[in-house]
């Protein structure tokens, strides 16, 4: 029965526009039983966009505007983890999480947000006025190799939404809602001296589809 604490801090400085950020991180783990543990984590994370985005310029109402002074996108990450060592060869992990994204680059009076951008080129003037949320739960059940058999099942249920420059909340492009992955295998020792391995492995994967805007 013991507590473990981790503290950290990181910083970034972008010389192009002289923006900087300081990001604290913290984690607390409570092992309250040899087989059970709970962990709570928080982190502030920042992201710089692709360099070419900062050099986009456009003429707006007779004035030249650019993305040169875009700030870092930021996100508060909160996570809770429950670990259960069921026995010497089975393990269960449950991880609910919540992420709040802010200062996201968006186009004013538009549904465009950098969160959904997937094209190689960008020709829009952006402002750090968007936001978003991601929340869900990840579950992993794993059996390590025993009697030549192993498996790992991972499942995720989640929601991903964003608010763009028109102040309307929408589902993000990657809001698939669910993921399920099943991996399993069996090994047999074969040959006269049982020194060779014959293995059979398989994987099944399901996920929800990407969001898209229908063409009228």
Each language-model region and where it sits:
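Feature marks flexible
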Residues: 1, 32, 45, 67-68, ...
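Transmembrane beta-barrel strand/turn architecture of Gram-negative outer membrane proteins
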Residues: 9-11, 19-35, 84, 154, ...
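Gram-negative outer-membrane beta-barrel transporters
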Residues: 98-100, 121-210
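Short sequence motifs at beta-strands and strand-loop junctions characteristic
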Residues: 1, 16-20, 69-74, 129-133, ...
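Surface-exposed extracellular loop regions of Gram-negative outer-membrane beta-barrel proteins
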Residues: 1-15, 21-25, 35-78, 98-124, 141-143, 147-159, 203-216
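Repeated loop/turn-to-beta-strand initiation elements of outer-membrane beta-barrel proteins
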Residues: 2-5, 35-38, 88-92, 147-151, ...
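Hydrophobic, lipid-facing positions within transmembrane beta-strands of outer-membrane proteins
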Residues: 1, 7-9, 22-26, 38, ...
